[in-house]
Amino acid sequence: MKKIVITMCACALMAGAVSCKKEKIDPIEQDPVPVYAEGIYHPVMKLATVTEDGVLTQEWNWVGDNLDKITSPDGGATTYNYTGNYISKVSTAGDQTEELRYYYDESNKFTKCEIFYDGMQAVTMNLTHNAAGKLSGAEVLVEDSFLLSLASGLLGGGSLFEQLVGRQAAESMIIMAKLQHAKNPKFTMGSKEFGMVLDWNGENLSSQVINGNASIILDTNDLNLLRMFIDIPEEYQGLIQMVMALQGGLPLTLTLNDTIACTYDTNYNPFFCNWGEIFSHRNLSLNNALTMTNTGAVKIAASLMGQTMDLYSYPLSDYQEYEYQYNEKRYPTKVSSGTEVLYTYKQ
């Protein structure tokens, strides 16, 4: 049995932060990331830093067969390697290592990104292009969500979507900007572990759980919606916590038949939710009012747009120490705070 102890702010659990204040990441401060290269694919490659609106702010060329390694301009612990098949970006923080592999085809189109933590793959992202060579879709598959979230906490990750596209705000924004102008764009996010898939076609966002009974239908064309509902520090990126992160009066319907437990911070945001047999409530329903109740022994009611909310039995302090225990497959088995066991997981 392995143990890891993380001390964080309760409302930023697993987010790698020590402050409850949510601050926007400035893309200009991010490490340079690969964007669409112009000219010959090999041996010329361009790397650039982009702003939120996709404007290049820094660019340099990577030229020649003999130049197989470059480092970030600030001399930080980030190294780029060209293997012949992909660009490998390796970053270190303490004894943790993150590797991003950016794949390009012979016409310089960015086609795939893979994310590894300590040599273990967490995410695969595939990009599709139309006949004109423009980006038309993105598919993100979570290979190991616990590994992804654990790395997020230790490496100081941002929103889940930023992690899924390489924990780069600039990269995620330019991808979404290109999708915004694509004809019939498609975005798919799924988890191989939990059989989840979530699709967005530019107008509607729908979701289903393959190995369960849950469905979500969101009627909106707001591109920022993705970043809003995915920006949750949660190790099981389940469907309920995504919905609960929504702010505002978006048309929303959620019906599910499963066991859910959620804890909320003082700003009515869930910082921990779990699909597990923790409580015995069933047949939950969440509609436009964004209020959830249950018929079991524990009442959970929250309104993200309203003024009131009921928390179940344990108080939230500004800072708590959480101890995560997990098995040899890297799945959590227990969450504790001091001597109090907060959650146990069905194995």
What are these regions, as identified by a protein language model?
Residues 22-347:
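Buried hydrophobic residues that stabilize the cores of well-folded domains
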